[in-house]
Swiss-Prot record:
It catalyses: ATP + H2O + a folded polypeptide = ADP + phosphate + an unfolded polypeptide. Its EC number is 5.6.1.7. Coiled coil: none annotated. The keyword Acyltransferase does not apply. It is an enzyme of class 5 (isomerase). InterPro entries: Chaperonin_Cpn60_CS (IPR018370), Cpn60/GroEL (IPR001844), Cpn60/GroEL/TCP-1 (IPR002423), GroEL-like_apical_dom_sf (IPR027409), GROEL-like_equatorial_sf (IPR027413), TCP-1-like_intermed_sf (IPR027410). One of its GO terms (molecular function) is ATP-dependent protein folding chaperone. Keywords: ATP-binding, Chaperone, Cytoplasm, Isomerase, Nucleotide-binding. This is Chaperonin GroEL. Forms a cylinder of 14 subunits composed of two heptameric rings stacked back-to-back. Interacts with the co-chaperonin GroES. Its main location: cytoplasm. The keyword Cell cycle does not apply. It is found in: Cytoplasm. It comes from Desulforamulus reducens (strain ATCC BAA-1160 / DSM 100696 / MI-1).
Length: 542
């Protein structure tokens, strides 16, 4: 296919137009007075959201060259979301500012490669300062503050803090849609393990890239399954008794067996999601036994004379719900007998007391937490489905932000952490275009606060200057200058750091781009019937 090529300044300007198109759509959502964005859906009601990455994922531009710029910024938002789970709008705003300031200097004749070096040195120093500024987070109140700032809602903040208190900071917290209009917290017996679906064709929710199974059977074996004949007898029994979904936990699934299960899933005849068994060696056997006890099933292993092709329905476990992601499986509401679960917990506690190996003790404690800790389920309710989806996105973001805060600590929120570190970049001693790179980062660091102020209907530059001179932060909700940490307006250090690193990475790529290559738009083929309109007059030939 023929390609279109554009060079130098034309190429960089096309990328900038794409960057701006996406950033302008996303940045209106920043801060407590940020607005919403409405996204049309092919089917059903539109989505209303203020989540940066959700908006970014929906944007495709008609012009191929501009679209490249938009996709690069989309990568900033997505990467920040993957690493920190929040801060996607901040990352987008930073990327736009770095690109804008950088391209001004490149157009004026600066060397982009040397500017890039200056940007990298400045970001390295800024990240060091963010880490040094971070305060560890301990109390339930501090956790609630982080979640409140992220979700822009006190009640959600308190709910997440309560969930973390109940299942521990490393516990499993999931967010589900509720039938009612209230949002509440429920702690359910459940467990998670770090294995995801074997094939992406098994997912049921393409937006979240996960498989959700309600009231499924759970088939547990330590075998590698490659022949579908081994599975057929038990799967036929499942189909005859109401065709419930099935979670298959096995050593591996391959060849004909995998192909057949995927084909049946795509046809809608049988919904089987397969995951590899967690752990290794003897620990794997113990973990499979834990899952079996939790779900009321049996581990089908030839070591005790059980064969897969002879499996009965009563050997299968069940659970209220299972969610399988790319690298994690969460089992909620296992149907195992309480007495057996308690017996297993007591057995693991005894092993913890007796073991002399620190490594074994750590792994046993992990198993104990999975069996005893349970899963906290936040059930999201709202008056309409559109509102519920928007609320669920905010809770997901707040949960991710809170986990990030527990991991790396907190810094002053509302964009003030970025403004506070601008003066520390004076210590980065560089010359010429490299110094220009440092200055570009300094100007870009003002941008999140400027945008928060603009969204609150104030003059951003005035607010930035006041924050720089007073050393306080700006509370956009009350429009006051306050000590941000004391006021509970805080951001996770991990989110702040990731947003800056990812924005700088993509901005440096845009600045050092010299050529863009894209497919040439195809001309529409002429309609072969268009020239035959005059044939209608042949009726008179009779």
């Amino acid at each position: 296919m023929a390609k279109e090529i554009i060079f130098r300044e034309d190429a960089r300007r096309a990328l900038e137009r794409g960057v701006n198109a996406l950033a302008e759509a996303v940045k209106v959502t920043l801060g407590p007075k940020g607005r919403n964005v409405v996204i049309e859906k092919k089917f059903g009601a539109p989505t209303i959201t203020n989540d940066g990455v959700t908006i970014a994922r929906e944007i495709e531009l008609e012009d191929n060259f501009e679209n490249m710029g938009a996709q690069l910024v989309k990568e900033v938002a997505t990467k920040t979301n993957d690493v920190a789970g929040d801060g996607t709008t901040t990352a987008t705003v930073l990327a736009q500012a770095l690109v804008r300031e950088g391209l001004k200097n490149v157009a004026a004749g600066a060397n982009p490669m040397i500017i890039k070096r200056g940007i990298e040195k400045a970001v390295e120093k800024a990240v060091e300062e963010i880490k040094a500024m971070a305060k560890p987070i301990e109390s339930k109140e501090a956790i609630a503050q982080v979640a409140t700032v992220s979700a822009n809602d006190d009640s959600i903040g308190n709910l997440i803090a309560e969930a973390m208190e109940k299942v521990g900071k490393d516990g499993v917290i999931t967010v589900e849609e509720s039938q009612g209009i209230g949002t509440n917290l429920e702690v359910v017996e459940g467990m998670n393990f770090d294995r995801g679906y074997i094939s992406p064709y098994m997912i049921t929710d393409t937006d979240k890239m996960e498989a959700a199974l309600t009231d499924p059977y759970i088939l547990i074996t330590d075998k590698k399954v490659s022949s579908v004949q081994e599975l057929l007898p038990v799967l036929e029994k499942v189909v005859q008794t109401g065709n419930k979904p099935v979670l298959l936990i096995c050593e591996d699934l391959e060849g004909e067996a995998l192909a057949t299960l995927v084909l049946n899933k795509l046809r809608g005849t049988l919904n089987v999601v397969a995951v590899k068994a967690p752990g290794f060696g003897d620990r794997r056997k113990a973990m499979l036994e834990d899952i079996a006890i939790l779900t009321g099933g049996t581990v089908i292993t030839e070591e005790v004379g059980l064969k897969l092709d002879k499996a009965e329905l009563d050997m299968l476990g069940t659970a209220r719900q299972i969610r399988v992601k790319k690298e994690e499986t969460i089992i909620v509401g296992g149907a195992g007998e309480q007495a057996q679960i308690e017996g297993r917990i007591a057995q693991i506690k005894k092993q913890i007391e007796e073991t002399t190996s620190d490594f074994d003790r750590e792994k046993l404690q992990e198993r104990l937490a999975k069996l005893a800790g349970g899963v906290a389920v936040i059930q999201v309710g709202a008056a309409t489905e559109v509102e519920m989806k928007e609320k669920k996105l905010r809770i997901d973001d707040a949960l991710n932000a809170t986990r990030a805060a527990v991991e790396e600590g907190i810094v002053p929120g509302g964009g003030s952490a970025f403004v506070n570190i601008i003066t520390t970049l004076d210590s980065v001693q560089l010359e010429g275009d490299a110094k220009t790179g440092v200055d570009i980062v300094k100007r870009a660091l003002e941008e999140p606060l400027r945008q928060i102020a603009n969204n609150a209907g104030l003059e951003g530059s005035v607010v930035v200057e006041k924050v720089r001179t007073t050393g306080k932060g700006f509370n956009a909700m009350s429009e006051e200058y306050v000590d941000m940490i004391a006021a509970g307006i805080i951001d996770p250090a991990k989110v702040t750091r990731s947003a800056l690193q990812n924005a700088a990475s993509i901005a440096a790529m845009v600045l050092t781009t010299e050529t863009l290559v894209a497919d040439k738009p195809e001309k529409d083929a002429p309609n072969p019937m268009a020239g035959m309109g005059g044939m209608g007059g042949m009726g008179g030939m009779m």
